[in-house]
Design a protein with these regions (language model features):
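Auxiliary Fe-S-binding modules of radical SAM enzymes
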Residues: 2-20, 215, 220, 224-326
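N-terminal pre-triad scaffold of radical SAM enzymes
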Residues: 8-57, 72-84, 219
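Core AdoMet radical
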Residues: 54-71, 75-96, 110-125, 140-168, ...
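Acidic (Asp/Glu)-rich catalytic clusters
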Residues: 71-76, 103-110, 130-141, 172-179, ...
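Active-site-proximal loop/turn and secondary-structure-junction residues that shape catalytic pockets
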Residues: 87-89, 121-123, 150-152, 188-192, ...
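Distinct, well-ordered alpha-helical segments
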Residues: 93-102, 125-136, 196
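Surface-exposed cleft-lining segments at the edges of enzyme active sites
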Residues: 116-118, 153-161, 187-197, 235-240
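Conserved C-terminal portion of the radical SAM core fold
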Residues: 166-230, 249-268
Length: 326
């Protein structure tokens, strides 16, 4: 990571305050039958230019277990449950090891088809995977969602992402050996790139994920959101960056080859706030005329994985692109 960027980003994050009374853990509906179990941990130890993960609680089993016991997962129709911390769920700095095991025991035997854990690739070890398999079982479908953002090293440096590609692929193969599926985050909207360069970077990255990662790996494509107390917001304030159009995200989706259309999902396309976002202030730009239509399209795309259907609705919405993007 860049020392200057990292230092300045950590200064910004110190100004982020969690609202008094915020639960240490909460169950949040994402979309359809996907839910997140969110833990207000002490904050990510990395320093991406677009993230505003601040400093929350130094979690312990004694602090979290009583709150977990108030959540009845069996009463909710959940297809996928995402385990998320304020950065990385497998980070022992954020989720102490005994708490990690307690959470696994809590979600086990709840008849949840898919359990996903969002974490930094450097937090994944064979020991942790073995514990996950021991507690959740060999037949449970388990995914890790990993930050990646771009296959291009120069673009990752703009994001201040600390990734070694060789090590990243080694971790991916480790996960494959234990039957852990991967969801790889791909980000649209890198600062200092043109719109065309931003789109092409995402297409190149999706191609890398599909061709170089283990079979069955999926990408998660999402447009960048400008949040308070981030370097991205600072760059906007001094006039060197502005939020992308929601139609740029549609254009990216429309240009993806049909053979890849069932290899990714989408996220963060519109207004979405929870205890962890600290207030997203700018999601992709739209106008009043097209906003509702776009939000409906994104939900439809998110909920349907059939490539032919996705291509159909992409062709339809791109053919009626709003004047606000022309």
């Amino acid at each position: 990571m860049n020392e200057y960027l990292t230092r300045e980003i950590w200064k910004m994050r110190k100004s982020i305050k969690t609202e008094a009374g915020t639960p240490v853990v909460s169950l949040v509906k994402v979309e359809n039958k996907t839910y997140q179990l969110l833990f207000m941990s002490c904050g990510c130890e990395n320093a991406c230019t677009f993230c505003n993960y601040g400093f929350d609680y130094n979690l312990t089993v004694e602090m979290v277990k009583p709150e977990l016991e108030k959540i009845d997962l069996k009463e909710i129709d959940i297809v996928e449950l995402e385990l998320e911390a304020n950065g990385s769920f497998l980070s022992e700095r954020e989720i102490p090891y005994d708490l990690f095991l307690e959470v696994l025991r809590f979600v086990s035997n709840k008849n949840i088809p898919v359990i996903t854990m969002e974490t930094h690739y450097k937090t994944i070890t064979a020991k942790k995977i073995q514990e996950i398999r021991r507690i959740l079982g060999q037949d449970e479908e388990i995914h890790f969602e990993l930050g990646f953002e771009s296959v291009n090293e120069d673009v990752r440096s703009i994001y201040n992402k600390d990734i070694n590609l060789t090590e990243y692929l080694e971790v991916a193969r480790l996960c494959e050996r234990y039957g852990i599926g991967l969801q790889i985050n791909v980000l649209l909207g890198a600062p200092f790139l043109t719109r065309e360069e931003q789109i092409q970077d995402c297409i190149d990255t999706l191609k890398f994920v599909c061709e170089k990662m283990p079979k069955g790996t999926h990408a998660v494509l999402f447009p960048i959101n400008i949040k308070n107390s981030t370097m991205l917001k600072h760059w906007q304030d001094i006039g060197v960056y502005d939020q992308i159009s929601s139609w740029e995200f549609v254009e990216l989706l429309h240009r993806i080859p049909e053979g890849y259309l069932d290899r990714f999902t989408i996220a963060w396309w519109g207004t979405r706030e929870n205890a962890f976002t600290k207030g997203i202030i700018q999601h992709p730009k739209t106008c009043e005329k097209c906003r509702d239509r776009l939000m409906k399209f994104y939900v439809d795309f998110y909920c349907n994985w059939n490539p032919s259907y996705r291509k159909k609705i992409l062709d339809e919405i791109w053919a009626t692109r709003c004047d606000c993007d022309k």
